[in-house]
Amino acid sequence: IEPERQEEEEEETRQRVRRGQVRQQQQ
């Protein structure tokens, strides 16, 4: 398992959560 890949996955999850929060705020 590459640590770099883990970081990328964490970033993607963070972005998704952030987008979800923004969507909730818009609603």
Swiss-Prot record:
Recite the UniProt keywords alphabetically.
Answer: Metalloenzyme inhibitor, Metalloprotease inhibitor, Protease inhibitor
UniProt-annotated stretches for the region Disordered: 1-27
Molecular functions (GO terms): peptidase inhibitor activity
Q: Which residue stretches does the UniProt record annotate as biased composition, category Acidic residues?
A: 1-12
Q: Would I find Cell cycle among this entry's keywords? A: no
Is the keyword Cell membrane assigned to this protein?
no
Q: What does this protein do?
A: Metalloproteinase inhibitor, active on a globulinase from L.albus seeds, thermolysin and gelatinase B.
Q: What protein am I looking at?
A: Metalloproteinase inhibitor 1
Q: Which organism is it from?
A: Lupinus albus (White lupine)
